Amino acid sequence: MNDPLKTIRETKPLIHHITNWVTIYDCANMTRAFGALPVMAHASEECAEMTGISSALVLNIGTPTSEIIDSMLLSAAAANEKKIPVVLDAVGVGATKFRDEMAAKILGSVRVDIIKGNYSEIAKLAGESAETKGVEATSINADPVKIAKQFAKLSSSVIVMTGKEDIISDGERVFIVKNGHELMGSIVGTGCMAASVIGLFAAVNPDYFEASREALCYFGVAGELAARESNGPGSFKVNLYDEVFNLSDEKVRSMMNFEEQ
């Protein structure tokens, strides 16, 4: 769409997160900085109802428990019924059997529109061999673009692989997003924030492939701008929020760096 950020700030979509306890505060603030409204409702007694009044659902398995996974399934079912986008951030898949089983349970039980993870996490979900150290990517043994395309076809979801270059595929098309800065990898939480950003862009754009590209371009441009004013991770994190808050569609269009394959 022509002016997604303007649309977000005018409509202020409510983005329901069931996310991890490490970065929940960061995801809420990043959602707000873009102009959307965050809500973090995890309890099974209310989560589906909260999803029912939201414009997108973002699930993050960074700190999984059986109870939280149950809430994710309830909310995702409500999102499917309402036909709002569901984003799954597969944090730490490949690190433990429990995470792998819970991710598979979600994907096997409900419709997930956008599946996000680093190269290792997506490779593991796609059945490829991959090495993961905690929640950090280490290495994969196959072409990531090929993995993204094949997994998108298999899952009927948009696949987002984040790394030095971000790979997005709907099974037929591929975007390679080159915006961003290495300082984004120096603070905990930018990957989780990226999932929130994808969710809020998908809330206003039903083309989830295009929405994912827009989200990562906008977030990456903000990272580039923040790095110019930063001396290290601490100042960078503060500046990242400020640059997102001060972004405009015109500014991002002049700095977008991506290619389509």
From Swiss-Prot:
<keyword id="KW-0479">Metal-binding</keyword>
<protein>
    <recommendedName>
        <fullName>Hydroxyethylthiazole kinase</fullName>
        <ecNumber>2.7.1.50</ecNumber>
    </recommendedName>
</protein>
<dbReference type="InterPro" id="IPR000417">
    <property type="entry name" value="Hyethyz_kinase"/>
</dbReference>
<keyword id="KW-0808">Transferase</keyword>
<keyword id="KW-0460">Magnesium</keyword>
<dbReference type="Pfam" id="PF02110">
    <property type="entry name" value="HK"/>
</dbReference>
<keyword id="KW-0067">ATP-binding</keyword>
<dbReference type="InterPro" id="IPR029056">
    <property type="entry name" value="Ribokinase-like"/>
</dbReference>
<keyword id="KW-0418">Kinase</keyword>
<dbReference type="GO" id="GO:0005524">
    <property type="term" value="F:ATP binding"/>
</dbReference>
<keyword id="KW-0784">Thiamine biosynthesis</keyword>
<feature type="binding site">
    <location>
        <position position="40"/>
    </location>
    <ligand>
        <name>substrate</name>
    </ligand>
</feature>
<dbReference type="GO" id="GO:0000287">
    <property type="term" value="F:magnesium ion binding"/>
</dbReference>
<dbReference type="GO" id="GO:0009229">
    <property type="term" value="P:thiamine diphosphate biosynthetic process"/>
</dbReference>
<keyword id="KW-0547">Nucleotide-binding</keyword>
<feature type="binding site">
    <location>
        <position position="116"/>
    </location>
    <ligand>
        <name>ATP</name>
    </ligand>
</feature>
<feature type="binding site">
    <location>
        <position position="189"/>
    </location>
    <ligand>
        <name>substrate</name>
    </ligand>
</feature>
<comment type="function">
    <text>Catalyzes the phosphorylation of the hydroxyl group of 4-methyl-5-beta-hydroxyethylthiazole (THZ).</text>
</comment>
<dbReference type="GO" id="GO:0004417">
    <property type="term" value="F:hydroxyethylthiazole kinase activity"/>
</dbReference>
<feature type="binding site">
    <location>
        <position position="162"/>
    </location>
    <ligand>
        <name>ATP</name>
    </ligand>
</feature>
<dbReference type="GO" id="GO:0009228">
    <property type="term" value="P:thiamine biosynthetic process"/>
</dbReference>
<comment type="similarity">
    <text>Belongs to the Thz kinase family.</text>
</comment>
<comment type="pathway">
    <text>Cofactor biosynthesis; thiamine diphosphate biosynthesis; 4-methyl-5-(2-phosphoethyl)-thiazole from 5-(2-hydroxyethyl)-4-methylthiazole: step 1/1.</text>
</comment>
